[in-house]
Amino acid sequence: MYPHLTGLGIHDPKQIERYSLRQEAHKDVLKIYFHKQKGEFFAKSVKFKYPRQVKNVLVDSGSHKYKEVTEINRNLTLVIDELNKITKPAKVSELDVKQKILSDLRHLEKVVSSKIAEIEADLEKLK
């Protein structure tokens, strides 16, 4: 029924609650969240990274200039189609987009702060 999700090792798609998709450098990161089971504090999730496909597009035919562009991996689009059938996501409003951008920014701040602290701790060990 869901061959691409099964290919990712997800054998019970009915347990999927939602998913998120974000871009990091030249990769798309898909995170799938499952329904929380009894006795669990947090819902389980799995993360998959897909490299973006690189294409050269002709920008100016007179000078034969090309521009390198990236686009979503074809396999990822097939997985997202299956996820949309399961989760039936609602239309996203402009306010929701703003909230998502702010949420992504806060997440990035935490990741960078954590990495800086880790590097500083490594430096302290060297003293």
Curated annotation (Swiss-Prot):
InterPro entries: UPF0325. This is UPF0325 protein VP2321. It comes from the Bacteria. NCBIfam families: PRK13677.1 (NF010213). Belongs to the UPF0325 family. Pfam families: DUF3461 (PF11944).
